[in-house]
Every structure is written in structure tokens, then in C-alpha cells.
């Protein structure tokens, strides 16, 4: 037995009004855009013999974008520069970024984003001073992450970059 309410019976409330929409007229299919030509990634090799044994490349160029792998304080011979000296290590990492970008026909002013990793937050100012000096007023978007350690013993800083080749 249905109970009464102000709106009528509950059984009656379960019945809903149906709204019937008329079907929209058929449209012509939109013209398809031709597919963009595939852009192949290009490996960037700065010519360092020591990095041949690594499972990655120092940079990739895709169209006008250049992705620079994390650079550390290793010189062209693969030797650690500036053990215990964050400024010297930052200088070498930035020099390596510059070298990778140059191999792709770009420069430091083309950098649009940088990510840095340091092992000691107290060394941030020293690292930042050197980076700012080298970038000479150029200010890319940036992130800094403090980490417990980097890939090899003695490393204090690692920096990666994304650049837009003009």
C-alpha cells in the first residue's frame, strides 16, 4: 500500500516525466587536419669519451627543444672537479651545460628551465651566486632540490636544463 505525502503517493513519485529530445540534424564530418610530420629526437654528443659507457646521452633535441641531462662536476676527461667546493663544482656543471648546448647550436641564454640538485642546503647561496654570475642576468624558470647524495661520491651539485633553440 502506498503512503500519502504532500506530493501524492510514493508510488506515484517514482514515476518520472520523460523529456524526449529531438535528434540533432546530422553534421558533416569535420575536415581532418593532416598529421604533423614526425619529429625525431636527435642525440646530442658533446664529444666526451668518458660518457660512452653511460646508459644515457648528455642531451636530446626534439624540434627546437633541447633537453640537457643532469650535469655534474666532471671535466671532459671524466675527472671530478672541485672536491668539497660547491662553487667550483657549480662552475663545472654549468660549463658542461654550455658545452652540451653548444653541440646543439644553442647557448646559455636559450635556457628556459633549470633544475638543480644539491646535497647541502646550506650551500645554496654559494651555488646560486656562481650560477647567476654565469647566466649573466638571464633568469630561467628554476627548481632546486636538496638530496641526500648524487650518483658518484664527492659530487655536491647536479644541474639539468631545458632550452629553446631560436
Task: Give the location of each predicted region.
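N-terminal presequence-like segments and the immediate start of the first folded domain
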Residues: 2-95, 99-112, 118-166
Amino acid at each position: 500500500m502506498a503512503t500519502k505525502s504532500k506530493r501524492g503517493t510514493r508510488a506515484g513519485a517514482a514515476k518520472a516525466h520523460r523529456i524526449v529530445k529531438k535528434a540533432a540534424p546530422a553534421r558533416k564530418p569535420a575536415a581532418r587536419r593532416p598529421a604533423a610530420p614526425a619529429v625525431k629526437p636527435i642525440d646530442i654528443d658533446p664529444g666526451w669519451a668518458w660518457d660512452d659507457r653511460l646508459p644515457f646521452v648528455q642531451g636530446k633535441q626534439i624540434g627546437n627543444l633541447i633537453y640537457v641531462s643532469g650535469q655534474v662536476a666532471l671535466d671532459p676527461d671524466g675527472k671530478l672537479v672541485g672536491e668539497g667546493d660547491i662553487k667550483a663544482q657549480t662552475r663545472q656543471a654549468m660549463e658542461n651545460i654550455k658545452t652540451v648546448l653548444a653541440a646543439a647550436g644553442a647557448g646559455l641564454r636559450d635556457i628556459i628551465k633549470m633544475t638543480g640538485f644539491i646535497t647541502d642546503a646550506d650551500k645554496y647561496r654559494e651555488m646560486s651566486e656562481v650560477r647567476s654570475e654565469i647566466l649573466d642576468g638571464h633568469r630561467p624558470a628554476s627548481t632546486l632540490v636538496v638530496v641526500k647524495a648524487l650518483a658518484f661520491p664527492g659530487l655536491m651539485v647536479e644541474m639539468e636544463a631545458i632550452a629553446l633553440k631560436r
